[in-house]
């Protein structure tokens, strides 16, 4: 979005901040990162009325403790947009992005809390599966452009097809 708004410096700074913040949990990504990249702030409930009397009023966000599979597609899509806009991805960054794609191959079949941050039992969400497909598709695009190593590209291609089949037969 920042690139499309004509803010390439801010887009680059955000991309590198995200890669830096996620370094400690690599290849896993957290749902939320504080601005300083530190540990999440716990969620707490306040004894106040919210908008139009709604309750509970929460400070913080418990989603930080959830699994949301869509975040991997967001990151790899961002990396591809950055690279296509002329951003340089060094070898180490390419290896890290490939590691994220490898992780997606291992975890996409799991249920998650989805972008809706469901607070109960994790479920299979179409959006989450689609974003796992996006993650692997964008990893393949980055691979084809020489930005990430191709060592596991055949696995990514196989899993892209498996995710598509899952979406077409089990999702709605």
Descriptions of predicted regions:
Residues 1-172:
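Acidic, mature catalytic/reactive cores of soluble proteins
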């Amino acid at each position: 979005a920042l690139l499309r708004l004509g803010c390439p410096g801010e887009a680059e700074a955000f991309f590198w901040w995200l890669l830096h913040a996620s370094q400690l949990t690599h290849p896993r990504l957290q749902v939320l990162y504080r601005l300083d990249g530190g540990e999440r702030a716990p969620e707490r409930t306040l004894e106040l009325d919210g908008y139009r009397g709604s309750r509970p009023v929460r400070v913080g966000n418990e989603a930080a403790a959830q699994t949301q599979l869509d975040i991997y597609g967001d990151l790899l899509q961002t990396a591809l947009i950055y690279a296509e806009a002329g951003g340089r991805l060094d070898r180490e960054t390419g290896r890290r992005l490939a590691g994220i794609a490898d992780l997606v191959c291992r975890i996409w079949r799991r249920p998650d809390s989805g972008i809706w941050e469901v607070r109960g039992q994790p479920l299979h969400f179409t959006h989450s599966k689609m974003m796992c497909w996006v993650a692997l598709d964008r990893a393949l695009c980055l691979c084809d452009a020489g930005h990430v190593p191709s060592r596991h590209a055949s696995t990514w291609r196989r899993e892209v097809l498996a995710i598509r089949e899952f979406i077409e037969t089990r999702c709605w």
